[in-house]
Amino acid sequence: MLGGGQLGRMFTVAARTLGYRVMVLEPDQHSPAAQLADEHIIAPYDDAAALTLFGTACDVVTTEFENIPAATLDFLAQFCPVRPSAHAVKMAQDRLVEKEFVRSCGLSPVPFAAIRQPQDIAAAQGSVAYPAILKTARFGYDGKGQVTVKSAAEAEAAFAELGEVDCVLEQRVDLQREISVILARSTNGEACCFPVAENEHRNGILHQTIVPARIETQLAEAAQAAATRMAEQLAFVGVMAVEFFVTKQGELLVNEMAPRTHNSGHYTLDACLTSQFEQQVRMVCGLPFGDTRLLSPVVMVNLLGDVWHDAQPDWLALLQSANTKLHLYGKREARVGRKMGHYCTLAPELDAALEEAGHIFQKLQ
């Protein structure tokens, strides 16, 4: 496993449950995944000696976040299979490249314009209406590297604030829902989707995921078909996520993709027969798909460092709920906006799960 965050941690649990040994390469000696892995190489992702040791020791390599250098994945591919490939990961590292890829799949991205120099902002006014969001093309996640702008003048100021690096200017769309599809694709090209998730964000960070998504079946099937098409075009192997916007006119727009397991798929740990992490193990190791059926309506709520205040939260209010599962990631320091854990609340009816999950979150506040 390249990367030692919480996604790698939950992958490690799934892999060891299936009898595999896991080696993590991650610079942070206290990372969540390294705490549970069989072996941990503490090194940067571009350390050739460490990568050689890692590649020769492993039967297959996978990743838990998309900002691993593509050159690192290409280097490791000389020793063992790398799943997903450098090509697939590289596609998700640049928002401009990703949006052109979405178009090449015959799908619709959010209206956008490439901003590489200040004069591009004026030129974009014919294709992007304000308000809009200016995002760095690379290295942005969880609301980082993006600024909401209401005019060309604000966009110019934001572009300067972001260092005049390559950016994407995205039109703000009138949303009905935000949804995501977690998809697994095997070495023989077969694909399998998890139930579509509905996502609610706060300050650019996922707050809660609601499953099943409160959308029409036809729209859910269209989202799964779109995600499958993208995976096929990438010759993807592993687990990936595609986020969509559903407009108030019922249009489906691709927001972004992640070539890995995803925060909005954490509900699968408790509400599906097979979790997204076990499915990742199965895909990279050449095993059959696990069953992705939803066993119960579920609401997943993220726990950010915000709820820690000056001490560990009192988990009693949460653990008193017999149908709620707590997952903590083993991070040493709680910070505002940092994902420290999550919980899943299950109920026979979705409304009941929503009510109880919300009640628990209020108590933790």
Show where each model-derived region lies:
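A short linear hydrophobic-aromatic micro-motif
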Residues: 111, 131-134, 166-170, 240-241, ...
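Protein kinase-like catalytic core scaffold
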Residues: 192, 240, 252-256
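Short, low-complexity Ser/Thr-rich regulatory SLiMs
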Residues: 183-187, 244-248, 330
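ATP-binding N-terminal substructure of ATP-dependent carboxylate-amine bond-forming enzymes
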Residues: 1-97, 104, 119, 358
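Peripheral (often C-terminal) accessory segments that flank ATP-dependent C-N-forming ligase machineries
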Residues: 282-365
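Active-site "cap" helix and flanking loop/linker of ATP-utilizing ligase/carboxylase catalytic domains
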Residues: 221-242, 248, 258-307
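Active-site nucleotide/adenylate-binding loops and adjacent lid/helix of ATP-dependent enzymes
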Residues: 91-180, 184-203, 207-233, 357, ...
